[in-house]
Design a protein with these regions (language model features):
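Low-complexity, acidic/polar, glycine-enriched regions of mature
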Residues: 1-192
Length: 192
């Protein structure tokens, strides 16, 4: 017997999944956070996320698109934020968006996995990551808040070609997306 809450299904065996349909990323509750080592010290920051998800049957044909505004990078330091958004790093004036587009969603014995393309500064990079699905409280209208978290590691050379003394090669990313039903979506995640 499948246990259901509005928007989430928990079939026998316990692997939760979104119900089929269109979902919108709530930008007020969603972000990508990052950590990178610079001269042996961690630098942490965030980027707000928007986008959409289309869950289909079979699940492998589902699609997701996440978008982060490069100019909205936030580390808690206005000077560092300007540096990261500037031409030496994210170059937000020339490349205002960083995006992820899924190509395959699948369940493995270790959990949900997604394979897709991360676009940074007009260059695409293949990316695979694991996903976790959670109920995250209740929305003001009483419907459940559904959270998807994912994590991956990217190469700092995807962000900058400049040699920066002490900049670590690994950038650890974690995305936290709060999803809500998208009743106005007509064509799926590719429209976001």
């Amino acid at each position: 017997m499948t246990t259901m809450t509005p928007g989430m299904q928990l079939p026998p065996g316990g692997r939760p999944r979104l119900a089929t349909g269109s979902w919108r990323v709530d930008p007020a509750q969603s972000h990508a956070s990052f950590a990178v080592s610079v001269v042996g010290r961690p630098v942490r920051g965030r980027l707000p996320l928007s986008g959409g998800v289309l869950i289909t049957e079979p699940i492998e044909d589902s699609r997701a698109r996440l978008i982060a505004r490069a100019g909205a990078v936030s580390t808690g330091s206005p000077v560092l934020d300007r540096l990261l958004a500037g031409s030496g790093f994210l170059d937000a004036a020339a490349f205002p968006e960083i995006s992820f587009r899924s190509e395959l969603l699948t369940w493995t014995p270790a959990g949900w996995r997604v394979i897709g393309r991360l676009q940074v500064k007009n260059a695409e990079h293949e990316l695979a990551c694991r996903l976790a699905l959670h109920l995250g409280g209740t929305r003001p209208d009483g419907s459940p808040r559904i959270l998807i978290t994912s994590s991956w590691v990217i190469d700092s050379r995807w962000i900058t070609r400049q040699w920066i003394p002490g900049l670590g090669r690994r950038v650890v990313m974690t995305c936290s997306c709060s999803l809500e039903p998208d009743r106005g979506l007509t064509g799926g995640a590719d429209e976001h």
